[in-house]
A protein has these predicted regions:
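N-terminal transmembrane alpha-helices
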Residues: 8-40, 44-45, 58-73, 77, ...
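Alpha-helical transmembrane segments of multipass membrane proteins
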Residues: 36-40, 110, 118, 152-156, ...
Length: 467
């Protein structure tokens, strides 16, 4: 017992947080680095190629985040079961994730392939690149089953405290992607005096490279899960277990609606930006890619926050929850101040990595420096949301996120760009206002203590004692 208490003293907790967070951060860093490489490789072909790849990226977020929401339901269930020491209950969740992968993967494969030719039109993509964007989109969604496996099985492993395996699979996926990009995007050419084979497929080559790497990653993480000592679904019946699915769905459904609603907002946001022309679309696409690297500390810490909060709730340890909140928020804000400062200082250098167009670079630098200032505030909302996910409270984040996205970002951007004829800078100003609103809502809810079910339980017990 004393050993357990010592391990959750502040510096012991820092070690625990970082042990869970660093593999996710490293995985995100690798993934973002590959996005950078992808964008740079495609950008070398020309601005049209960059726009074709980036024009449908928000739809990718929409689908990817909806699948990820299913994983959040299992994360809450398994992390709480592990915190309570109930390994049997945690193991039962594994076969249900297999069902989730099969259902989600098959559904989104059929849906997205059927809609691939229509998505660029709905996104107001320039008619000159609509066919190319549609082909890219079709190829990217062919291996959706494998993509669902990477997302959901990866979340399952993290919730049991294994963040390194998803990281290794992510490294493999991204490494294969880079190598295949090099071989498939460009034609056969001379590199350092040597003839290097190239398929010369351009944007299509980038899509094929991504699809193949997803298949490899999906197979690998499935094999790892089948061999896992605690979570292997081997020997379990592949049928719905409602004792597991009901609590998972109670958490997953609001989170799925939140992600779907906010991602649909991203689609509407990007659609309005696409209507501003090729320069604005390219600058927005590249700036988004650059910005994503500087959110890595935030989302890495969110994974640790969700897992540890779920563990603490499962163990019934309210002191640990409070200590976790104080410590992880301090670490998060510190990291986001550093990352925001770096983004502000090096915005021109980052934009020049991906574009040679002076207009695209200048516009991208402006919006990146604007958003850099808001990063520490956004970091607070990321962490509080993560802790609430681990606790199984996903309704409040749903309400806050939808209100911010549609009430501030979308309405504001529509007024600025579509009615007043303003440009990309005004759209990003609306995005920053959205992030600041999230900070106020999540920080206020955290301070109130209502997000923690153990606080509510203690309050009820106090009232009963007084009676």
């Amino acid at each position: 017992m004393e050993k357990s208490k010592r391990s959750f003293l502040p510096w012991g907790m820092v070690s625990t947080i970082l042990t869970l967070a660093w593999p996710t951060m490293l995985e995100e860093l690798m993934q973002t680095a590959v996005q950078y490489i992808d964008t740079a490789m495609v950008g070398a072909i020309g601005t049209q190629a960059t726009a074709a790849v980036g024009a449908t990226s928000t739809v990718n977020w929409l689908i990817g985040s909806t699948v990820a929401a299913i994983g959040v339901g299992f994360l809450s269930f398994v992390s709480q079961a592990c915190g309570a020491g109930d390994t049997k209950r945690a193991g039962k969740a594994s076969s249900q994730t297999v069902l989730a992968v099969l259902v989600c993967g098959t559904f989104f494969t059929v849906l997205m392939l059927a809609l691939s030719s229509k998505v660029p039109v709905w996104m107001q993509v320039d008619p000159a690149i609509q066919d190319l964007a549609a082909q890219y989109f079709f190829i990217l969604y062919t291996p959706m089953l494998a993509r669902a496996a990477i997302t959901i099985f990866g979340t399952l492993l993290r919730s049991a405290g294994d963040a390194k395996t998803p990281m290794r699979v992510g490294f493999l996926v991204n490494g294969v992607n880079v190598v295949l990009n090099f071989l498939l995007i460009y034609p056969t050419r001379q590199v350092w005096g040597m003839t290097v084979f190239g398929a010369g497929w351009g944007v299509i080559g980038a899509a094929v490279a991504s699809a193949i790497s997803f298949v490899i990653g999906g197979v690998c993480i499935t094999v790892v899960l089948w061999r896992h000592p605690l979570l292997s679904p081997k020997g379990q019946k592949l049928r719905p277990d409602w004792d597991v699915l009901k609590p998972c769905l109670r958490v997953a459904l609001p989170n799925a609606l939140q992600r779907f609603g906010t991602s649909l907002g991203y689609v509407a946001f990007a659609s309005m930006i696409n209507s501003l022309g090729e320069i604005a679309t390219a600058a927005h696409t590249i700036a988004n890619t650059v910005e994503s690297a500087f959110y890595i500390p935030g989302y890495g810490m969110q994974t640790a926050a969700a897992t540890l909060a779920g563990n603490a709730l499962g163990a019934g340890d309210n002191r640990r929850v409070k200590e976790l909140g104080r410590m992880i928020l301090f670490i998060e804000v510190s990291l986001m101040i550093v990352s925001g400062s770096l983004l502000f200082l090096f915005a021109p250098n980052m934009m020049r990595l991906f574009s040679r167009d002076a207009q695209v670079i200048a516009l991208g630098v402006t919006v990146l420096r604007m958003v850099a200032v808001s990063e520490p505030f956004y970091g607070v909302s990321i962490i509080v949301e993560g802790m609430m996910q681990g606790m199984g409270n996903t309704m409040m984040p749903f309400v806050c996120s939808i209100a911010g996205m549609w009430g501030v970002r979308i309405v504001g951007t529509f007024i600025c760009t579509q009615l007043l004829g303003m440009g990309l800078v005004s759209a990003w100003a609306c995005m920053i206002a959205h992030n600041l609103l999230l900070f106020l809502l999540f920080a206020g809810y955290y301070i109130s203590g209502k997000w923690n079910p153990m606080n509510r339980k203690n309050a009820v017990q106090t009232v009963k004692t007084a009676d």
